[in-house]
């Protein structure tokens, strides 16, 4: 790790097709082996499927899904005197959004379905309706933090 200054955080430019920063971040999470155009096609196909099924704006539904999957607290391991405690900590907004996007992609890939765009569309619609694996993961994370509330004084 560099002893010099911390790396400058580069701003995320909005996606030109959807004019959304979140869409741009999602494309980066979907991308495998540098194939950005494939990731963009998957997201645009998923958005068109969402528009067909719901009749509403897919980008708004996507933003709702990300908001519903974003955790507010998480547990982090902390060693104190030979014992490791799961210490609940608040999640910064950028980290929470990144975790939500990561979970949405992970659980979309794990779904049963024909194409990745169909699986992603299904997971996004479920997350927007506060169901689905990514929202369940957020609830589990919150439950873990609640269960380990006694160790909150070990925060760092």
UniProtKB/Swiss-Prot annotation:
Keywords: Ribonucleoprotein, Ribosomal protein, RNA-binding, rRNA-binding, tRNA-binding. It comes from the Bacteria. CDD domains: uS7_Bacteria. The keyword DNA-binding does not apply. It holds the Pfam family Ribosomal_S7. One of the primary rRNA binding proteins, it binds directly to 16S rRNA where it nucleates assembly of the head domain of the 30S subunit. Is located at the subunit interface close to the decoding center, probably blocks exit of the E-site tRNA. HAMAP family: Ribosomal_uS7_B. Belongs to the universal ribosomal protein uS7 family. Part of the 30S ribosomal subunit. Contacts proteins S9 and S11. This is Small ribosomal subunit protein uS7. It comes from Prochlorococcus marinus (strain MIT 9312). The gene is rpsG.
